[in-house]
Amino acid sequence: MSQSISDIKLVKFYYRHYKLGPQDFCREYGGNVDGLNKFLTGNYDSLAARDALRSFWERFNTNQLMKSQAGDEDDGDEFNSTFGGGDSMLLSPIKVTSPMSSSSSSTNTTNSNGQIIGNRSFSSLAEATSNATTTTTSTTTTGGKPESKRVRNLLKTYYGPGIGEGSDSSSMNDPLNIDGPSFNLNSYFDSIVKSSTLNQLIQKDNQMVSEIRTLDGDMKTLVYDNYTKFINATDIIKKMKTNVENMEEGMALLSKNMDLITNCSEKINSTLSVRRDRIDQLSGLQKFFQKLQFLTALPSSLNHCLAMQAYNQAVRYYNSNSGILKQYSHIPSFQNIQNECDSIMKTMKDKLYERLSSLSTSQTDCVESAEVLMDLLEPVELVRSKYLESRKHHTITLLENLEKKSVEHITDYIKELNANFLSEYSYNITSYKSLFINRLDGSDSKKERQQSLLQLEDFSKDLFNKYLNIAKSKLSSFKDPIEKIMALEIINSDVSRLGSELSSHEKITNIINSTVHDQIDFYFDNLQKTIKEHIHQLNSTLNERRDEVLEGHNLQELSDATSKAIVNDIILLFANLKPFFLPTETQFLSSYQDTIFTKIQVKLQQFFLFLVNIHFLEYLDIIATTSNREQFSGRFLLVLSSICLYFENKGITLVVQLMSEFITVAKQGAKKELNVFSFNAPDLCKRVRETGLQILNVFTRLSSQKLDKILKKGLESIPNNNWLVLKEPRDVRSVNDIYLEEILKFQNETSKLLPVINHHHHSLKSHSRTGSGGNSVSSNNSSSNTPDGHRRNPSASSSSSSNNTNTTLFEKKVDHVDFNTLSVLIAIIKLSLKSFNESLRLKTFGTNGCHQIQIDLHYLKLSLYDLFGSNSFDNLLQECENTVTERCVDPLPLAKSIVSKICETKMNKKKNNEAES
């Protein structure tokens, strides 16, 4: 029997009936795992694998036969227990017993066959039915049990008590459980009357009557069917008895005829034995020569298949004969055939790999190539990688061609993109699973399957990310948020149809979330980019129109235009964000609105942090640390500080109003409560003001450096830079006029952007600040009198301190400025005078030089008093005069009357010139 089954049937029988892997099979039935795997893939050379499969086949059939015989014996016992006994039992299928015997019989049946009680034969059901019927009839005549009790006893007699899903102890002992053994009619009746209305009671009555009638009909039908089968069984038994009577004579006749046939067969065999052996020999030779003929023609057949691209047929030819060729490879002719076939198959493999990698190969041809290579037992890793590489390259080329197309309407483009990519993507996933995952059902390589799944996941993610990047890049080129939402909805609906293919690596939720979040990031990134462009455009305008912007209100208009442009960009941002929460247009986003809203709030906070603490202040870092500081003038910083002042007074209020409107729209469109972050407008105004003041401080420091350069240049402008041999002074040096003119320019510039405070209303607070500043300078002055290092090496001291003088003085000695013209100008002048004082410490003066500086300082004192109407700078000017006196080799102060006369003459001359002009 085992010799009659073919190898192909053995393989099919293995896959159909064996549920474990080849390793478990070899441990149970013997053989080698590699040999078994090759045998299962079509290489039938392994005798051990064939013997193991036949052993499995024989054992399986033997078990089935034993189970069948055991079932026949059980049926016979059941038949005897049901219909056996005396002759009286042959007349009727109804077994009349007493109630006690019926109950006992039912219990015994349940105990002995409890494990198969749900699969009883109809004969046992007939017995149970007859027992229950007789019991019910007897009880009804004596005690008058209701019909429902009779039906319940009938079913319980057949199935046995306590069998079923709902047979737990609590429900079985419930007196209100109509199917339980503890059922109490009176309690059930009282309970249902109390808990039900009249209509419900009538409905319950009709239901129970219908169930009773149905069960009665089923029981009668069951009894009739079993009675019919019983009659048929008795007829069969009678026929069997009749036929058995003549069986002995028939067997004797059959034995006689068999002996005659045996004698004739022996005579024929003895007569034809010689010829039969010859015929068998010739028949075997014919079959052998036919095989040899096919083997000799195998190379030409393979070449023909290769030319016709019938690769599957070539693989079948090769695999079916490779075993014979290997078996007789020691014979030269067979060795030549095998070498030629191997060469042809190698050529075919190369062509298959080439076709697999070609972009022009169709989807079906690509799958066929991979399948044929797998049938040729090529390494799975190599075929898998080549297949994925080919399909990935083909799909990416498709996406790149779509990416290059111009887009007029984003919705139409997304539809075309989905139609091309998603169909290709779905086919790739399905074909890959059929080739490398589902194909591995018969192998024991769980690691191989896992590796295939991981590579499929990477393949899918790469392609899907490329697809999403193209969609996002195209979406970013459109400004209409409504059209973007429609495009996202198309992506959502189309990708949702591929849920099964995406389940292993990408969820539709992640796709929508990432797309929407990226779109939100784009809005905010674009806002930051636009603000940077506004600021750079502002700086370019200031550099190109240096003089024009100072005419009229051009500077203020430029500042206001930049501020309003930034606010308009913020307004546009909220307009772009609102469609995400409009329920009539974004139904598919309803489940994502809470995360979208949280994302927007976080991005808003990051934006204000960027605007206040990062973007505006980064220009200060550029000016302080990079070589590009020259492209940002002090005027640019002044305008930037005025923009901060605008945001503090108006911009923040408008932004808060826009945010409140946006939150209202979001709450109306959301299906559940949104978590709204607290927005501290006063704190934001404070931060904006602090940023503006920092910028204004840097502007003040840069402006003071210009004044400081003028004063330092005046110190270096004397002949030979020698203050010891200077001629007797007779006038104020011209550098002081240049210094005052530069101050007037700063005043004109700052007054166009910052509020102007009346000089006469300048509070005493400025004088107190000046006094404190004077004290600090005096302390520094006294400390400079200690080791006289400046006197010994003034040039070295100058080179080491000139770069950081203004910064150090500004940080330690000058109060922070405020948003008004007077505060800024006072800070600029004070810082320049402090720096000038430090420069005086590095010089050595003669008597005339000391007198010249004394005259210059007195002239500045008078001029600054005329400008500001206060004595804010007297202490600083006095400190400068004290420094010159200390640095003079022969300090003889010039008479105050002479100083006053020279300065008054200069002042009058200056006023006359101004009046004439």
Curated annotation (Swiss-Prot):
Instruction: Give the InterPro entries listed for this entry.
Output: Cullin_repeat-like_dom_sf, Vps51
Task: List each coiled-coil range.
Answer: 229-259, 524-547
**Which keywords annotate this record?**
Coiled coil
GO terms under cellular component = cytosol; EARP complex; GARP complex; membrane
Task: List compositional bias (Low complexity) regions by residue number.
Answer: 101-113, 128-142, 775-785
Q: Name one GO biological process term.
A: lysosomal transport
Cite the Pfam families for this sequence.
Answer: VPS51_Exo84_N
Please list the residue ranges that the record marks as compositionally biased, kind Polar residues.
114-127
Q: Where is this region: Disordered?
A: 94-151, 760-805
Quaternary structure note: Component of the Golgi-associated retrograde protein (GARP) complex.
Entry-linked PANTHER family: VACUOLAR PROTEIN SORTING-ASSOCIATED PROTEIN 51 HOMOLOG
Q: Which family does it belong to?
A: Belongs to the VPS51 family.
Q: What does this protein do?
A: May act as component of the GARP complex that is involved in retrograde transport from early and late endosomes to the trans-Golgi network (TGN).
Would you tell me the protein name for this molecule? Vacuolar protein sorting-associated protein 51 homolog
Organism from which the protein derives = Dictyostelium discoideum (Social amoeba)
